[in-house]
Design a protein with these regions (language model features):
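Acidic-basic catalytic patches of nuclease active cores, encompassing PD-(D/E)XK
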Residues: 1-40
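Short glycine/proline- and charge-enriched loop/turn segments
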Residues: 5-11, 67-70, 124
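Short acidic/glycine-enriched loop/turn segments that link adjacent beta-strands
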Residues: 15, 44-47, 116
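Conserved catalytic cores of phosphodiester-cleaving nucleases, focusing on short active-site segments
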Residues: 30, 49-72, 81, 87
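Active-site metal-binding core of divalent-cation-utilizing nuclease and nuclease-like domains
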Residues: 36-61, 128
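Positively charged, solvent-exposed patches that mediate nucleic-acid binding
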Residues: 42, 54-55, 76, 92, ...
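Mid-chain, well-packed structural core segment of small domains
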Residues: 71-102
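Domain-level recognition of nuclease-like catalytic cores that cleave nucleotide substrates
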Residues: 96-129
Length: 129
């Protein structure tokens, strides 16, 4: 699912501002589409999950990647196999420590945001255990 929004910013965002913007936009998108946000920026040891949500009695772990341009590739391409393993490890701890059902889906929300437009792409089942 891809959405385009025409937004204009007078100055270029810092990487930190862009990351925060992307995570907030992803949360709004998920809520609008019927997801319950369970946790944001969940940390375990040195690992982090951007968003843990729930929909249709399934835990949905979401990695958000935001870039100002897709010139070197779409943001979702930055979720390497190593990063996937780290997210899975962290998600397993979250689920086991809360005695939640083991049915989990791993999604990526990929956002390109700049002064000309914002493009959001939600990739469901982007990777698996």
């Amino acid at each position: 699912m891809t959405f385009f929004l025409n937004l204009y910013k007078k100055r270029r965002m810092t990487d930190q501002e862009l990351g925060i913007f992307g995570e907030q936009m992803a949360q709004k998108f998920l809520l609008k589409n019927g997801y319950l946000i369970r946790k944001v920026n969940y940390r375990y040891l040195k690992f982090e999950i951007d968003i843990i949500a729930e929909k249709d009695e399934k835990i949905v772990v979401v990695e958000v990647k935001t870039r100002q341009t897709a010139e070197i590739g779409e943001p979702w391409m930055a979720v390497t196999r190593k990063k996937q393993r780290q997210i899975i490890f962290c998600a397993n701890e979250y689920i086991q420590s809360r005695d939640l059902p083991n049915e989990v889906r791993f999604d990526i929300i990929s956002i390109v945001h700049n002064q000309f437009r914002t493009k959001l792409e939600h990739i469901e089942d982007a990777f698996s255990t």
